[in-house]
């Protein structure tokens, strides 16, 4: 069955006729199961809970979609780099993720309206004096590889910026907490979660990326 190629962050349809999308939806209903990709390690949107099941905001949205369609839900945990390939190879029908839209991605997928008040930004100690990408020279910047933050910062960071790419959100968070990087580039909800979990961590939004 062809993938319905949907992003829920920011329901998107694969580039093509609406009649094709309707046929793909019919396939999902006939199969009685919808395969939805969600973040494998990106709290609060998706992560493995203490009960051994995936939980989070995106997981809840996936459950609502399956219930609304009246089909069984098959959750497929993915990393940031796996999201588009899993759609393109029909491993999943939909992807629900905090993924920013850009012209390159829009060539193969359509984005829904954003479902959460989410933005990407640079976060660091309140005492670190930076306010734009131009101020990153000489600093170590941690982010998750293959994300929109990676694409945007690779273009805008000045010479002398050390961009350190990690395999998943958990590793990126850990690097910032341990002092391995000076600046954390991620979503505002991730930064808010870090502050909540670490009351002594005095971090601030330095600038917005997307």
Q: Where are the regions a protein language model picked out?
A:
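A structural signal for short loop-to-beta-strand junctions that line the ligand-binding cleft
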Residues: 25, 57-58, 106-116, 202-206
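Extracytoplasmic small-molecule ligand-binding "clamshell" domains
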Residues: 23-98
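Short helix-initiation/N-cap motifs at beta->coil->alpha
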Residues: 59, 74-85, 164-178, 189
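Periplasmic-binding protein-like
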Residues: 116-124, 188, 192-210
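Ligand-binding cleft/hinge of the Venus flytrap
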Residues: 47-50, 62-71, 112, 133, ...
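Short beta-strand-centered segments that line the small-molecule binding cleft or hinge
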Residues: 83-98, 106-118, 187
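Flexible hinge/capping segments at coil-to-helix
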Residues: 124-141
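Alpha-to-beta junction loops
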Residues: 34-35, 69-72, 89-97, 139-140, ...
């Amino acid at each position: 069955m062809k993938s319905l190629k949907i992003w829920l962050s920011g329901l998107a349809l694969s580039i093509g006729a609406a009649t094709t999308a309707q046929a793909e939806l019919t396939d999902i209903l006939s199969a009685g199961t919808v395969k939805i990709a969600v973040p494998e390690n990106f709290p609060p949107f998706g992560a493995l809970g203490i009960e051994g099941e995936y939980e989070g905001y995106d997981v809840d949205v996936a459950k609502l979609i399956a219930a609304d369609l009246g089909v069984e839900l098959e959750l497929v945990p993915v990393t940031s780099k796996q999201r588009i390939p899993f759609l393109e190879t029909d491993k999943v029908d939909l992807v629900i993720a905090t993924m920013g839209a850009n012209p390159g991605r829009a060539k193969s997928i359509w984005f829904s309206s954003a479902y959460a008040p989410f933005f990407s930004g640079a976060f660091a100690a309140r005492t670190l004096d930076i306010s734009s990408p131009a101020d990153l020279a000489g600093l170590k910047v941690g982010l998750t590889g293959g994300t929109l933050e990676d694409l945007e910062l690779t273009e805008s960071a000045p010479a002398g910026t050390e961009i350190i790419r990690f395999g998943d959100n958990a590793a990126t968070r850990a690097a910032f907490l341990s002092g391995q990087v000076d600046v954390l580039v991620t979503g505002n909800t991730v930064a808010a979660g870090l502050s909540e979990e670490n009351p002594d961590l005095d971090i601030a939004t330095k600038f917005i990326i997307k």
